């Protein structure tokens, strides 16, 4: 059995989970998330906790039981607390501005970069060099953060670019004559 799948997913107050043979739906105060269930994984609801187990002893089923448990745990956390990802803009003239369902970025290109926000991800810009992404789906929030960072990843000599909050950029030394 997967070591991750051994631990049950405890449902906090206000969060409920419903599942069929095909999918699992988790509802909470912040929203609702659904995900298809793997055919090799068995899910049981026992006293407000979801338990995962492999249906057979194949390596794929054992592996997927741990994966499903981790994904459902992220869904439960998302609908109860939500997820947040912070980005910082480092560089002269690098600015960000939230405009409705889009993010306007000035990143040293000859044109402004407009990144549309997908449904379920909210963006805030407390300052011109700070971006905060919020949502209930951890994968979606992380994907949007990675897409924004990819417009201008931190370069290795001065560290200019878009970086995650707390990210350590290793700077290279310049060439010596």
From Swiss-Prot:
Recorded GO MF terms: rRNA binding; structural constituent of ribosome
Name of the gene encoding the protein in the UniProt record: rplF
Gene Ontology CC entries for this record: cytosolic large ribosomal subunit
Subunit and interaction comment: Part of the 50S ribosomal subunit.
Similarity field: Belongs to the universal ribosomal protein uL6 family.
Superkingdom per UniProt: Bacteria
Keywords, alphabetical: Ribonucleoprotein, Ribosomal protein, RNA-binding, rRNA-binding
Originating organism: Laribacter hongkongensis (strain HLHK9)
One Gene Ontology term from the biological process aspect of the record: cytoplasmic translation
Protein function: This protein binds to the 23S rRNA, and is important in its secondary structure. It is located near the subunit interface in the base of the L7/L12 stalk, and near the tRNA binding site of the peptidyltransferase center.
Protein name: Large ribosomal subunit protein uL6
